[in-house]
Every structure is written in structure tokens, then in C-alpha cells.
Amino acid sequence: MKSASDKSKEITNKVKKLLEEKGKEPLNAARNLIFKNKAICKEIRDALKYFMYEYWNDLTTPTLLCLSCEAVGGSAYQVKHIAIPLIMISGAIDIHDDIIDQSTKKEGKLTVFGKFGSEIAIITGNFLLVEGFTLLNEFYNKLPRNKSSHISKIIMNSLFELANAEALEISLMKKLHNGKRVKPEEYLQVIELKAGDIDGLFKIGAILGGGSKAEITLLGQYGRYLGMLSILRDDLMDLKDFREIKHRIKYEILPFALLCALQNFYVDSNTFTFIKFLKSIKRVNDLWDVVIKSNGLKKHKELMEDIAAKGYSILNNLRYRKYYLKLLLDFLTLT
């Protein structure tokens, strides 16, 4: 019988292999197309080269499109061409998000903002947006009008949700640092909105694969749950990374588990005390003491289990190639 550690490694390796198999070709195509533009100045070209080849490796976008398409009986080829512009747009959002969050480094690597400054980062993100939407428009012209219109509305809605999520997160962060209590349920709204992009990817894949209205809706719901699990898993990972969690305490909203811990401080004036305490922490273990003793970690894991259960239940109503969709849920619930 395999140990929990061996099972975790097996699932992780399967997901890595899946991402490489489904995502590598579209990602490389996106990289090649970007650098065909000869009008890019050296400063932007350097930033793009760093971002696309050294910092960022978006295998996720094309993989999720592919899995959704296959889940309704379609093939990877049907989503190949839309994956390229969506990779670019996703990259632009990532660059701009780092500026908003003042993130100069992630996972040991400098962000574009951290390496080149805010001005170059903004322009680089804008370039990717323009390139992405230009290619997206070309793709629309090759589709039946009803499909292109449907996909366009989904993409716009996903972008609006992301924008609303950022605005709400900034509002909650300011509220927290002004000594007001932020409830975990308020942050959960941010998580649900941020998961809108994954919801959108799964709907698009299902549309291009010829899925029924019911299948498109189901896969969108699955994508929403998957996106929420990914964010909550990142929250837990941040709690293990001292540099990242100190940055979040200073510039971003607290992870869900810490907001649950904050509920022990019912009086608004005590929120200052809690934030001051978090800023004074010198070791990751001290943070874990807080989230464990306050039941914050327990509530965090219970939330993830509840969301995962909803995701698994959706798989019962899908007809094709559900194995990889289950694998992703298994991976995101590893702790």
C-alpha cells in the first residue's frame, strides 16, 4: 500500500506530465508569435523575453481548454488557436496584478515589475493585451457568429469579474489596515470572482468542442470550483513561505485561514493589535501556531473539502474523459 507521501508525489508527477503534454505546444506558439513583431523596442523586447522564457510558464490555460473540450467529445486541435491569444491575455493580467500587489519577487524569481520597474511592466502588459485581443479577433472571424459572440461574452465577463475581484480585494485590504474587521466570507467573494477566469476557460473549451448547453454550464461550474481550490491552495502555500506571507500582510488581503483567526478579535480596535502582531512575527511556525490554535486551518481545509466535493459531484454528469478532471481535483486538495 502506498504511503500518503508516495501518493502525493504520484499525483503531482501526473499533473506535471499532463501540463507538458497539453500545454507546451500552444505556449511555444504564443512565444514565437510575440517575437515576430519587429516593431518592439529593445526595452519591451527584453522584458517580454524575460517574462515569456524565464519567469512565466503558462501551461495551465491551454491544458484547461483542452480538457474541457475533450470532456464533451472534442479534441485538442479545436482549442489550439484560441489558446494562444488567451495565454497572452493571461500573461498581461499577471504582470499588471504584480504591480497592483507590489510583488517584486515570486517563488524566488523577480517579477517583471521587480526587474524592470512599473513603467516597463505596464507597457509590457499592455503589449500582451493588444497582441492577445488582435489574435482573438482573427480567431472570431473564423467561427460561426453565434459561437464567436458567445465566447466573446464569456471572456468579457471573466475579465469584469477579475477587475471586480481586484477592486474588492483592495477595498478589504484598506479596511483591514484601517482597523476594521474583515470577515472570511468577504474574502470568499473575492475568491469566487477570481475563479471566474477558470470558469470561462472551461465554458470556452466546451463550446468549441460542441458541448450542449447543460455541459457548458456544468463545466463552467467545475472550472469555478477548480479556480477557488487553486486560490485556497495558494493561500496555504503562502503560509509556508515567510517572505510571501510577510508581503501579503503588508500589501494584500490576508489568507482565508488568518481571516478566520482574526474572528477571535471581535472588537474593531483589536484588529490593529492583530495586524501589528502578524507584522512582528519572525518565523513561519509562529503563524502556523496562530492558524491552528484559532481553528483557522481547520476551517480552511473544511472549505476546500466542501468545494472539492461539489467539483467531484459534477464529474458524475459528464460523459467523456473525466479522469484528468478528477486528477486536478485530487492534486489541488493535497495538503
Task: Show which residues each predicted segment covers.
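Structural helix-adjacent loops and short alpha-helical linkers that scaffold large soluble proteins
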Residues: 76-78, 143-146, 212-213, 265-274, ...
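Acidic, Mg2+-coordinating active-site segments of isoprenoid diphosphate-utilizing enzymes
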Residues: 67, 72, 95-116, 133, ...
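All-alpha helical catalytic cores of prenyl diphosphate-utilizing isoprenoid enzymes
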Residues: 29-32, 36-41, 52-62, 123, ...
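Amphipathic, well-ordered alpha-helical segments in soluble domains
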Residues: 60-63, 88-91, 95, 128-132, ...
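Conserved N-terminal diphosphate/IPP-binding helix and adjacent helical/loop segment
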Residues: 1-114, 168-181, 308, 324-335
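C-terminal charged capping/lid subdomain of soluble metabolic enzymes
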Residues: 5, 285-335
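Aromatic-rich carbohydrate-recognition surfaces in CAZymes
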Residues: 118-129, 135-136
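Short, well-structured alpha-helical segments
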Residues: 45, 49, 80-83, 152-159, ...
